[in-house]
């Protein structure tokens, strides 16, 4: 029996798909994450934008091209939003985003397998994504995810530590829909970080919200043996007026102060971010504030995308900007982001850094430094090992590097 588990969307979706794959492998099945011939397809969908939702709906037809008689099981945010659309396509089973274990129950029941629930995800040799929470209570005016993922739910610290202890990966990434709000009973994200102080693994964080950046939080991170100082601090707009309309709960000035605080504790930190181009209320003046904050903060990387109105959100009721304006602003943001990324990497040329080797391809071993600079070393190096390197020049989306210690 062969199964394909195909995923669209965020890192949380990827972690959940990895759990589904690990469970199906326990059934003794051959499992792949690439669309190809299979007896069973599990399609994990996304609805963060209209384009993502469209691609999700098209997945059923794409799967059937490989095997018209395959059994198709659908889960994720797009099927949570519109379950009927998938049921009408004649798939075997549809669940949503909130309990993906139902997929396993449905498959186990149909094929006579033991329903043991979702397994811990099978990890790569280098990086383990550890899901610490799900859901979001923020209800930003443009975002559909809280309506689909539901209210925030966090895992016990003991369960998280147990999963980390079982992985052989040298790096773990704490992951979730809104990890800044992590809290099981009386524990907080700070408490979880402190509980990791004795781990020898490199600890990296998923996307963060502005409110979590405090001296207490940064001090806890300083206490880790091996912290990767990359802070993905979601911005969305550089304009305080637009942030208000987005229901983001901070101003431009407050965001900049949080970034300054990060640099006080971690001078070499990579601060990366998301910015929406062309939100419904965004004027040209507002947009210029988004453009200028890229240089002011010194972002190491900018993920920019055009505003996509999502039915069911507050912002959906607002008058949308013309597509050409959104497109033009997006291109300007992307260009500014490329300049900022290159400027950040140049700071580290001819300086010693470490990186964990991830893969060897076309004559290069690649991987990432703690501050998330992609490294290209023109040698074969064993994956999963940490090496000392010196960056020599900018190359593609990172930098060439020479090996200085094995």
What is the meaning of each model-derived region?
Residues 101, 138, 150, 180, ...:
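Glycine-centered loop/turn positions within well-structured domains
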Residues 123-125, 136-138, 227, 237, ...:
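Short flexible coil/turn linkers enriched for glycine and charged/polar residues
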Residues 42, 77, 103, 174, ...:
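Residue-level signal for inorganic ion chemistry
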Residues 1-181, 216-219, 231, 253-264, ...:
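Proteins enriched for Cys/Gly/acidic motifs involved in redox and nucleic-acid/cofactor modification
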Residues 317-406:
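Terminal RNA-binding accessory module
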Residues 72, 81, 168-284, 295:
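Conserved SAM/AdoMet-binding glycine-rich loop
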Residues 13, 49-52, 79, 210, ...:
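Alpha-helix N-cap/loop-to-helix initiation residues
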Residues 52-54, 151-156, 183-187, 245-248, ...:
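Short, solvent-exposed loop/turn segments at secondary-structure boundaries
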């Amino acid at each position: 029996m062969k199964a394909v588990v195909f995923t669209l969307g965020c890192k949380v979706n990827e972690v959940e798909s990895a759990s589904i794959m690990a469970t199906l492998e326990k059934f003794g099945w051959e499992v792949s994450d690439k669309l190809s011939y299979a007896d069973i397809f599990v399609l994990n969908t996304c609805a963060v934008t209209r384009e993502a939702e469209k691609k999700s709906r098209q997945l059923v037809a794409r799967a059937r091209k490989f095997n018209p008689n395959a059994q198709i099981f659908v889960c994720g945010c797009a099927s949570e939003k519109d379950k009927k659309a998938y049921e009408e396509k004649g798939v075997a089973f549809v669940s949503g985003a909130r309990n993906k274990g139902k997929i396993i129950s449905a498959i186990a029941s149909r094929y006579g397998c033991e329903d043991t629930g979702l397994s811990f995800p099978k990890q790569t040799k280098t990086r383990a994504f550890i899901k610490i929470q799900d859901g979001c209570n923020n209800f930003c005016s443009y975002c559909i995810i809280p309506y689909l993922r539901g209210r925030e739910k966090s895992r016990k610290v003991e369960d998280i530590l147990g999963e980390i202890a079982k992985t052989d990966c040298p790096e773990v990434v704490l992951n979730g829909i809104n990890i800044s709000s992590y809290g099981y009973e009386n524990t907080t994200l700070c408490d979880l970080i402190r509980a990791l102080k004795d781990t020898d693994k490199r600890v990296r964080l998923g996307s963060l919200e502005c409110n979590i950046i405090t001296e207490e939080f940064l001090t806890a991170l300083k206490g880790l043996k091996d912290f990767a100082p990359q802070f993905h601090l979601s911005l969305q707009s550089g304009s305080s007026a637009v942030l208000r309309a987005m229901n983001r709960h901070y101003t431009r000035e407050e965001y900049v102060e949080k970034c300054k605080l990060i640099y006080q504790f971690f001078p070499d930190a990579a601060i990366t971010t998301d910015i929406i181009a062309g939100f419904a209320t965004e004027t040209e003046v507002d947009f210029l504030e988004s453009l200028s904050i890229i240089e002011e903060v010194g972002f190491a990387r900018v993920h920019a995308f055009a505003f996509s109105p999502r039915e069911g959100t507050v912002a959906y009721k607002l008058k949308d900007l013309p597509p050409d304006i959104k497109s033009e602003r997006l291109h300007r943001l992307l260009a500014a982001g490329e300049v900022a990324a290159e400027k950040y990497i140049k700071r580290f040329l001819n300086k010693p850094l470490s990186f964990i080797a991830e893969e060897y391809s076309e004559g290069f071993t690649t991987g990432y430094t703690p501050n998330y600079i992609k490294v290209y070393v023109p040698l074969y190096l064993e994956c999963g090992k940490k090496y000392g390197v010196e960056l020599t020049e900018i190359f593609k989306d990172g930098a060439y590097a020479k090996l200085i210690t094995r």
